């Protein structure tokens, strides 16, 4: 199939200085061909969550504040007078969300320096959009009402969706109840969030590849310095090129397929007008999936260490971002309880659809959703429900102890503190990219 000249070009630029590198990418993709200096611009970075107890190493997790500032500088040079930055960060701990991320990553100072408005989509009023008979998405009004919406995700892989790029970054514009609904056991995560772009209609997508993240999206991924920027007025075109750079074909990604099918758009990168750098020079395949034991009783390390007794089935696409850290915590705590001998037969469930299996003396249910899903489950001998959305970390540890697992909360804290500082002293990992 030949290149579709009616589609917006997709730019690939190397990042080597600010703001010129981004300027090259925007010029190549004709980013401002439909832009007026009178437009109200909304910038949507990826500030997925904020953790004050165990700070998330920012590389590859968050859109670099440096690139956001570069974009603001270029917009100001163009004469733009009204610029907002909006996000709806997940609250790992209640009350610690978007505003904490704005403060911690320099956005508060950025707003003061350039006269910007910061918007917490979690606090916004919303408009509802029906998708068929089963799905209604509540989207923050500010995300819908700007004249020129700029989507700024990070180049990363993701344990539930393979990649997390432009289409998925828009999930941060949803209200909390709609974010949860996307993880509904009878719906499909990637089908659900693929529709958000139909309503927001981003004018421009800029994918920040200064760092790329493998097996994201929070504390546990591995970041690599990559120094690329992908930009296009076509969100799918940008996502296809970015996915290609980290080893994925468009046909590999379910939410790409859903979006492309509705819009009768090609998933073949060869059909797009790629400008700038040669993509072949920047390809580095990244892993996305976490390995589990063959019998689905725990992460792959359980088999390596010879852990028997407990079962922690692999997460599925119903596990929300809020409960994801709790599920990881349970894995680490069970590891801490292992002293070389078989552990009690305890099953630990999360998400919204896992079903307790027969053969376990006790079943720990992490969160309100999985408690409801197993309310009538006759396979469960003795349930240990840990209520909450998400449940509190200390209550998770207490439930595991009640189940007979001698977990070491100190070992968990040490591990998490290690994740926070894992890039310290390593060449190329520069905190200046996340400060103003």
Each language-model region and where it sits:
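N-terminal and secondary-structure boundary signal
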Residues: 1-436
């Amino acid at each position: 199939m030949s290149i579709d000249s009616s589609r917006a070009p997709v730019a690939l630029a190397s990042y080597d200085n600010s703001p010129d590198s981004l300027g090259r990418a925007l010029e190549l993709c004709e980013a401002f061909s439909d832009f007026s200096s009178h437009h109200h611009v909304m910038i949507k970075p990826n500030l997925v969550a904020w953790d004050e107890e165990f700070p998330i190493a920012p590389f590859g997790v968050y859109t670099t504040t440096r690139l956001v500032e570069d974009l603001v500088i270029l917009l100001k040079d163009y004469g733009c007078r009204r610029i907002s930055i909006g996000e709806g960060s997940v609250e790992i701990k209640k009350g610690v969300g978007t505003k904490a991320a704005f403060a911690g990553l320099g956005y508060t100072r950025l707003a003061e320096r350039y006269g910007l408005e910061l918007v917490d989509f979690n606090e916004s009023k919303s408009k509802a959009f029906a998708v068929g008979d089963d799905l209604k998405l509540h989207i923050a009004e500010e995300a819908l009402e700007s004249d020129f919406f700029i989507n700024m995700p990070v180049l990363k892989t993701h344990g539930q969706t393979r990649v997390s790029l432009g289409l998925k970054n828009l999930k941060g514009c949803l209200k909390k109840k709609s974010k949860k609904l996307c993880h509904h056991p009878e719906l499909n995560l990637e089908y659900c969030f693929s529709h958000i772009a139909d309503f927001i209609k981003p004018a421009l997508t800029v994918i920040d590849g200064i760092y790329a993240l493998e097996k994201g999206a929070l504390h546990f991924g591995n970041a690599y310095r990559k120094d690329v920027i992908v930009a296009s007025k076509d969100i799918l075109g940008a996502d296809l090129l970015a996915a290609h750079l980290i080893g994925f074909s468009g046909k590999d990604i379910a939410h790409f397929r859903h979006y492309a099918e509705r819009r009768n758009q090609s998933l073949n990168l060869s059909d797009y007008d790629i400008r700038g750098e040669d993509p072949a020079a920047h390809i580095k395949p990244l892993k996305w999936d976490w390995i589990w034991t063959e019998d689905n009783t725990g992460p792959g390390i359980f088999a390596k260490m010879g852990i028997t007794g407990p079962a922690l089935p692999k997460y599925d696409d119903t596990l929300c971002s809020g409960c994801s850290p709790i599920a990881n915590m349970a894995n680490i705590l069970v590891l801490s309880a292992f002293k070389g001998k078989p552990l009690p037969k305890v099953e630990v469930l999360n998400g919204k659809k896992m079903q307790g299996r027969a053969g376990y003396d006790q079943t720990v249910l992490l969160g309100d959703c999985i408690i409801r899903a197993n309310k009538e489950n006759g396979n469960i001998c003795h349930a240990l429900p840990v209520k909450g959305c998400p449940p509190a970390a200390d209550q998770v540890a207490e439930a595991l102890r009640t189940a007979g697992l001698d977990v070491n909360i100190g070992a968990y804290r040490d591990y998490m503190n290690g994740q926070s500082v894992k890039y310290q002293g390593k060449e190329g990992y520069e905190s200046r990219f996340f400060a103003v």
